[in-house]
Amino acid sequence: MSLPIEQYPELLAQKVDNLTALLAPFNPPPFDIFASETSHFRMRAEFRVWHQKNEQGENDLYHIMFDPTTKQRYRVDQLPIANQLINTMMQKLLTQIQGIPVLTHKLFQVDYLTTLSGEIAISLLYHKKLTDEWLAQAKLLKQRLSEPGLTVHIIGRASKQKIAIDCDYVKEKLNVAGKTLIYRQVENSFTQPNAKMNINMLEWAQKCTANSQDSDLLELYCGNGNFSIALAGNFRKVLATEICKSSVHSAQYNIAQNGIDNLQIIRMSAEEFTQAINGVRQFNRLQGIDLSAYQCNTIFVDPPRAGLDQATLNMVQNYPRILYISCNPATLADNLRQLTTTHRIERVALFDQFPYTHHIESGVWLIRK
């Protein structure tokens, strides 16, 4: 499997053209363009596992993926878009579990999650119950895969069962504008897949929101606190919402690890928060939190591909400054049709989070007219 690296500048230019065309009706300023590394940029990968008898009658294992068009499976020995640690561990893992039936029997998927700081979580997914024998062999596997300067975590998952050898997360360290930020990233939870592009996104967001220490920030869909932790130093206080329980726990850990004392996470959806802030409903989860104490002049949104729902869009429009990170330029453009009736676009960025795909990640900074 090879990458069309020589075509990367042209492919990126096509994305710029596509985003330019979508946003043209809103008269945006020139874009800030952030190109990706051309290989080994992806920090996580998922593979199905294929079992095949060799000539000796032994069970060989391969990583496989599926062609998105034909749906045909194909063998993957190396994945150039994945970082070097994943590629190294792909070969090492299969070698180390070969011939150990309790580790290979009914193994159907392997997930890898890595960090720039030299950690990897390997999740082994099974169509069987995990036993004490599996646990004993998984502990030995962790020892064999570990080496100086490399932290390896092994997680086993089966129906209604999850066993982590030591822990089920990696600890990432990102150098953002000269400051090291620490993030716990839990396996099987969302994290930004392109770590170096994530740094670009965080630094761009910091520049947009600079000199805001006299007001507060509201963030919807905060995940593990990726943006809110990086932006906390720019504001007096930060209030952030997240619905996923494991992400909230990670965010609380990350807040403590980074010594952030002005960031409050509440577990509720954007739709629920809209109801709360408008006084439509009261929530027990907000006991002890005085929403009126926050003077949020800036709102940060990073919605799913569907974009902002109508109620949230109406609520977002009430804030003087809007920072919008989008993973779908079509729904971004749709949302901007309403937002630009009251706000002007101050800055736009294209972050090439997913090279060699049609996917466009972008950021828009809006100021009330």
From Swiss-Prot:
> Can you tell which superkingdom this protein's organism belongs to?
Bacteria
* EC assignment: 2.1.1.-, 2.1.1.35
Task: Give the UniProt entry's GO cellular component terms.
Answer: cytosol
Q: Does the keyword Oxidoreductase apply?
A: no
Where do the TM regions start and end? none
List the InterPro entries. Answer: MeTrfase_TrmA_AS, MeTrfase_TrmA_CS, SAM-dependent_MTases_sf, TrmA_MeTrfase, U5_MeTrfase_fam
List the Gene Ontology MF annotations in alphabetical order: rRNA binding; tRNA (uracil(54)-C5)-methyltransferase activity, S-adenosyl methionine-dependent; tRNA binding
Active site: residue positions:
327 (nucleophile), 361 (proton acceptor)
Q: Where does S-adenosyl-L-methionine bind?
A: 192, 221, 226, 242, 302
**UniProt catalytic activity:** uridine(54) in tRNA + S-adenosyl-L-methionine = 5-methyluridine(54) in tRNA + S-adenosyl-L-homocysteine + H(+); uridine(341) in tmRNA + S-adenosyl-L-methionine = 5-methyluridine(341) in tmRNA + S-adenosyl-L-homocysteine + H(+)
Alphabetical keyword list: Methyltransferase, S-adenosyl-L-methionine, Transferase, tRNA processing
The family database entries (CDD domains) matched by this protein are listed as:
AdoMet_MTases
Q: For this chain's UniProt record, which GO biological process terms are given?
A: tRNA methylation
| Pfam family for this entry, one | tRNA_U5-meth_tr
Q: What is the recorded function of this protein according to its Swiss-Prot or TrEMBL entry?
A: Dual-specificity methyltransferase that catalyzes the formation of 5-methyluridine at position 54 (m5U54) in all tRNAs, and that of position 341 (m5U341) in tmRNA (transfer-mRNA).
Q: Which HAMAP family match?
A: RNA_methyltr_TrmA
Known PANTHER family for this protein?
TRNA/TMRNA (URACIL-C(5))-METHYLTRANSFERASE, TRNA_TMRNA (URACIL-C(5))-METHYLTRANSFERASE
Which family, according to the similarity comment? Belongs to the class I-like SAM-binding methyltransferase superfamily. RNA M5U methyltransferase family. TrmA subfamily.
Protein name (Swiss-Prot/TrEMBL): tRNA/tmRNA (uracil-C(5))-methyltransferase
Query: What gene does the UniProt entry assign to this protein?
Result: trmA
